[in-house]
Each structure stands twice: as C-alpha cells, then as structure tokens.
From Swiss-Prot:
Protein family per UniProt: Belongs to the TrpF family.
GO terms, molecular function: phosphoribosylanthranilate isomerase activity
Keyword Amino-acid biosynthesis annotated: yes
UniProt KW keywords: Amino-acid biosynthesis, Aromatic amino acid biosynthesis, Isomerase, Tryptophan biosynthesis
Pathway given in the UniProt record: Amino-acid biosynthesis; L-tryptophan biosynthesis; L-tryptophan from chorismate: step 3/5
SUPFAM superfamilies xref list: Ribulose-phoshate binding barrel
Enzyme class name: isomerase
Gene3D superfamilies for this protein: Aldolase class I
Protein name: N-(5'-phosphoribosyl)anthranilate isomerase
InterPro entries: Aldolase_TIM, PRAI_dom, RibuloseP-bd_barrel, TrpF_fam
The enzyme's E.C. designation: 5.3.1.24
GO annotation (BP), single: L-tryptophan biosynthetic process
TM helices/strands, residue ranges: none
Taxonomic source organism: Jannaschia sp. (strain CCS1)
Length: 215
C-alpha cells in the first residue's frame, strides 16, 4: 500500500512522543478538553510539543474553544495546526484561521449519508477536514470513542477540494480495509493505541504502522 500519513492523537507523556516518532507518525495531537482522559494542561503540552522531532506536525485539538483559551494555547505551545472538534460553525472556523494564522482542521462527524453535506460547508474555510464517527448519543466526548462508521459512505466521493483525514475506530486490524474502501491518504487514531484510557502503548503504535506498511 502506498504511503498513508498517520496522526497519533491524545499524547500526554514524553515517552508517547518518542514512540509516535519511532512509529512513523506525520502528525501528533494534544487534547485540550477536560472531559477527555487525554486532556493535557498548557504547560504539559508545551513540554511535549518541544520534544516533537522536526518534520512531525504538532496539532492542538480543542472543542468549541473561546478566544481566551486559544490565545493561551497558541501563545505558549509551539504548534503547526489547530483541530476544531466541536460544533464550530463555518464562520467560527474562518475566524479562528484568520486570528491565529495557523492551518485549521475541522472535524466532521458522520453516521449517515446526509452528514457528508457538511464537507461542502467547511471545505472553503478549513485547510483540512477530519472525517470521524459521529458522537454517539449521550457521549461526552466528540471523538476518541473507538467507534467506526460506514466507510462505504465515502467510497463514492471522488473529488475533495482540501486534504482530509479518516478517523473513528481505526485499528491495526481494520485500517487496511478502511483505506481501501475510502481512498484515505491520512488516518487518525487515539484509543486503539492505548493500554488504558489516556495511556499510549508503543507496541500498538508500531503494530498500526506495520499494518499500513504491510497492507
């Protein structure tokens, strides 16, 4: 299988950063959302970001963050991208992109075909899109829930105006099928590379990368 870029999200320890780099990650994500077991403080994220090797993009994941929080994050943590994983409107996405001068990736939750309409709403204002499983009813977290969606919904979409990333329940066992079905050239995962909630596992990172390489 030709090269697929990997984003390991929800890193919270220095050893996670090293393991992600060794496993060939192209992106690493830091979560700023208190309801997530992967939540990091701003000083913690700064320490982690400074340890990321050159060539790996550092992404801050936020959920409906206000300017005060974003100002604090961007001023203290060296970043390459902001990931908006809440219910931010296209207007808010454009506003954040203009305010901070950083590339913005907007997450879009998918459960059925109608959810794909959001792609055309957000593509004009985002630098990338993250196509993730729609948040289950009652779930507190918008992502990182380990659930997949029907990948065939994306199979018919041949034209994308911005780069995109596939997320939602990806594992070493299913990622090859996911990539073949959707045509994704970038993938994002979090819970599948953990030994416990919020605790990343180097062996699982390596296994995921190997599955893509061998597939």
């Amino acid at each position: 299988m030709s090269e697929v870029a990997i984003k390991f999200c929800g890193l919270s320890r220095l050893e996670d950063v090293s393991a992600a780099a060794e496993a060939g990650a192209r992106y690493v994500g830091f979560v700023f959302f208190p309801k997530s077991p992967r939540n990091v403080s701003i000083p913690q994220a700064r320490e982690l970001a400074l340890a990321v090797p050159l060539g790996i993009a550092k992404v801050a994941l936020v959920v409906n963050a206000d300017d005060a929080l974003l100002d604090e994050i961007v001023s203290q943590v060296p970043l390459d991208m902001l990931q908006l994983h809440g219910s931010e409107t296209p207007e808010r996405v454009a506003e954040i992109r203009a305010r901070y001068g950083l590339p913005v990736m907007k997450a879009i939750g998918v459960a059925e075909a109608a959810d794909l309409d959001a792609i055309d709403l957000y593509a004009p204002v985002a630098d990338q899109l993250l196509i993730d499983t729609k948040k289950p009813k009652g779930a507190e977290r918008p992502g990182g829930n380990g659930a997949t969606f029907d990948w065939s919904l994306l199979a018919a979409r041949k034209y994308w105006t911005v780069p995109w990333m596939l997320a939602g329940g990806l594992t070493a066992d299913n990622v090859t099928d996911a990539v073949r079905t959707t045509g994704a050239r970038q993938v994002d995962l979090s819970s599948a590379i953990e030994s416990a909630p919020g605790v990343k596992d180097a062996a699982r990172m390596q296994a995921f990368s190997a599955a893509l390489t061998d597939g």
